[in-house]
Curated annotation (Swiss-Prot):
<comment type="function">
    <text>Catalyzes the ATP- as well as the pyrophosphate-dependent phosphorylation of a specific serine residue in HPr, a phosphocarrier protein of the phosphoenolpyruvate-dependent sugar phosphotransferase system (PTS). HprK/P also catalyzes the pyrophosphate-producing, inorganic phosphate-dependent dephosphorylation (phosphorolysis) of seryl-phosphorylated HPr (P-Ser-HPr).</text>
</comment>
<protein>
    <recommendedName>
        <fullName>HPr kinase/phosphorylase</fullName>
        <ecNumber>2.7.11.-</ecNumber>
        <ecNumber>2.7.4.-</ecNumber>
    </recommendedName>
</protein>
<dbReference type="GO" id="GO:0000155">
    <property type="term" value="F:phosphorelay sensor kinase activity"/>
</dbReference>
<feature type="active site" description="Proton acceptor; for phosphorylation activity. Proton donor; for dephosphorylation activity">
    <location>
        <position position="185"/>
    </location>
</feature>
<keyword id="KW-0808">Transferase</keyword>
<feature type="active site">
    <location>
        <position position="250"/>
    </location>
</feature>
<feature type="binding site">
    <location>
        <begin position="161"/>
        <end position="168"/>
    </location>
    <ligand>
        <name>ATP</name>
    </ligand>
</feature>
<dbReference type="InterPro" id="IPR011104">
    <property type="entry name" value="Hpr_kin/Pase_C"/>
</dbReference>
<feature type="binding site">
    <location>
        <position position="168"/>
    </location>
    <ligand>
        <name>Mg(2+)</name>
    </ligand>
</feature>
<keyword id="KW-0067">ATP-binding</keyword>
<dbReference type="Pfam" id="PF07475">
    <property type="entry name" value="Hpr_kinase_C"/>
</dbReference>
<dbReference type="InterPro" id="IPR003755">
    <property type="entry name" value="HPr(Ser)_kin/Pase"/>
</dbReference>
<feature type="binding site">
    <location>
        <position position="210"/>
    </location>
    <ligand>
        <name>Mg(2+)</name>
    </ligand>
</feature>
<dbReference type="GO" id="GO:0000287">
    <property type="term" value="F:magnesium ion binding"/>
</dbReference>
<feature type="active site">
    <location>
        <position position="167"/>
    </location>
</feature>
<keyword id="KW-0723">Serine/threonine-protein kinase</keyword>
<dbReference type="GO" id="GO:0004674">
    <property type="term" value="F:protein serine/threonine kinase activity"/>
</dbReference>
Amino acid sequence: MELTGVTSQSIFDDNAADIKLSWVAGLEGADRAFDVEFAREATSAADLVGHLNLIHPNRIQVLGKPEITYYQRLDDETRKRQMGELILLEPPFLVVADGMEPPPDLELRCTRSSTPLFTTPVSSAAVIDHLRLYLSRISAPRVTMHGVFLDILGMGVLIMGESGLGKSELGLELISRGHGLVADDAVDFVRLGPDFIEGRCPPLLQNLLEVRGLGLLDIKTIFGETAVRRKMKMKLVVQLVRRNDGEFERLPLDSQYLDVLGLPIHMVKIQVAAGRNLAVLVEAAVRNTILRLRGIDTLRDFMDRQRAAMQADAVSRGQGRLL
């Protein structure tokens, strides 16, 4: 996992309000970060944060009530040895959760070694879950793509195509039909799971749609709060193509996909031509995709019916020749 620029200070700033963190010791370790090699070998955020564990001292260590109770039962010599092993490998920071008071000797050792020590009244399990989700999000693969990203019938749809094909005009038409805008022109996508890509709008372009001849439109102001979305899961790509595009298949037998961050996203191509109602076609493509996700494939069903009809016709002809 790539965690460039992630420090104890940045993690504290981003999460202090949500999980009620207080910084009680080791202020000089604000620039403390994950070991580069350790972070690179981590396969998920679960490797980067967890309950007190001396086998994995490089990760964020969370001490709840059971860990503090265990620590207090140790004799002085064992405490010094175990905490020495932990502090020596410079974990990003320690968190004392469950509203527990950090033991004085632990606080003193963190101060002397410039190891950040946080406290929180939140349960240790909740702290771990929150930090794992946070680290997963900031370390997830991401990409910015050109197009219009919309919420159509509850599905995240990216409309792509060459410049001048009318992507923004199509987006405006779909918004006027009750669908929602996520982003126009530049869409930030991040892969948050094995089969989950989320799309958002860059802050600079929030709620804006550019239409040739009209300029920038504030969709939230014009159509209301319900016409915009903060984020959506990407489920479908609609590729607009010119009418003379030689690669266009009228009836594609195999499903088409676009690779986005290593995940295949279902794609449909729609030809742009005078008189075609693209908004209706996009809505139909979305409805058809919803059916496909439910296991209903209209083209395959038709091909099966056609095959059965041809076989029945062949059988009847064979019987006719026998007679």
